Amino acid sequence: MESNTASDKTDIGFDREDRYTRPEGEVQDPPNSFWSTIKYLGPSVIISATIVGSGEIILTASLGAMVGYTMLWWVLMSCWSKSILQAELARYVVLSGDTYLRAINRVPGKIRGPRGYFSWPIILGLLAFIPGLTGMGGLVGGAAQAVGLVFPEFEPLWVVGCLAVITAILLGSGSYHRLESIMLVFVLTFTVLTVLSLIFMQDTQYATTVEQIASGFTFEFRTEYAVLALAAYGYTGVNSGEISSYTYWCIEKGYPARIGRYDGSEEWRARATGWLKVLRTDVWITMGLLTCATIPFYFLGAGVLHASGQRPEGSEAISALSYMFTETLGPWSLWLFALGAFCILYSSTVAAVAAGGRYIPDYLMELGFLSRDRVDVRKNIIKWYGLIVPFVGLSLYAGFQNPVLMVTIAASVAAIMLPVQSGITIYLQSTRLPAEMLPGRAASSFLKLTFLFHLVMAVLVIYFVVV
């Protein structure tokens, strides 16, 4: 059983090495300029692809359609309140060499399993996994509906099937670098299209006014739309699933390997400090990208759909959302919206499936079914997951055929998981990191306030959604 006492503060390098997180011979000094830092960024690109597909195009625009501009404050808070957790959980992972599931398995409160003891958050993660698959089915279904806008003769279920095949082919190699390259194209495409759409809207009758923006900061909360608002909170910005998957992308980008095993030396501290700066830059880029994607979709939903009475629901959700473009730019823009929606939703599907494959071998290891030194088995599981799970998404979509409902279910579960993650991050930092590697006072205080806020939000989700 793992020790979790304060004496562990200098033990972050004393576990048996995990060659997944720290391959041999990759210790490297950090870059010393902004331009040299750029080539070491990348996890933000993958996580941004995951973020915008679910919360932004479906839930954020839907919330704007329902309430207008009055909950702009809520959307911004949902975007920005979780980045501190993203940064601080990643801090622990890259310094310790733990994977995400290895980290949460260090929390006190052990449960006896068939192969030994494990911590209670492991069970919560497993319980959240199925709703996450449901959300993935909603994303690929939404991508199929986007294709159907310009090719209405194509049956959506058949399009989902084709996308499942393409996803399996793309992810069959399990390569991080291949995934990063694919996501970069998608992220650049949908970010440019989304920002352009908002700019074009300003030349129409739906142009956003200063008064409308001001109404978004009256801090009004429309309780009749609480379920949708809380779902948007759960999935807008980095949600709990994306926060955890971000740590795996940091591992595969090589941050823990370049920092190296903790030895208490000044050289290690200098490397760790430098690579943490790279990590923070990557987190800031994530927040910038998701803000550029979120606000335009909320404004389009509030300015166009709310004013015209359109409501994106059920199997016609993506078609209703396309009204944001066609009403402001003309019928030709249906192709523009379809391309943007497809890039957003399908990139989220690919990134979500790729992330899911990283959890499975870790679960097997933490539950005692697989040795941690079997990096070869880990890689094979990741590949097979990428080949099989896209067809699970196809099956789930065939059963629901309602992207908004499917994503709302997953988003509600994601919101409930946030206080668990923030509480665990506070615990792990305070008990297992050297004092000189802890966050500053401001960041530490903000993380604790975030934990309390996430706790309140989780209670509201349980009250409005579950009960």
Q: What kind of region is each of these model predictions?
A:
Residues 1-58, 116-119, 255, 259-260, ...:
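Membrane-interface "cap" regions at the ends of multi-pass membrane proteins
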Residues 20, 60-62, 87-116, 145-148, ...:
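Flexible loop linkers connecting adjacent transmembrane helices
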Residues 35, 62-91, 101-105, 119-121:
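Extracellular loop-to-transmembrane helix junctions
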Residues 48, 82-90, 113-175, 234-238, ...:
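Helix-loop-helix module between adjacent transmembrane segments
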Residues 84-95, 250-251, 257-258, 288-319:
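Extracellular/periplasmic helix-exit of transmembrane alpha-helices
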Residues 141-150, 163-186, 197-201, 396-403, ...:
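Membrane-water interface regions at transmembrane-helix termini and the short interhelical loops
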Residues 153-162, 332, 364-398:
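Loop-to-transmembrane helix boundary motifs in multi-pass membrane proteins
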Residues 188-248, 421-434, 458-465:
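Hydrophobic alpha-helical segments and their helix-loop junctions in multi-pass secondary transporters
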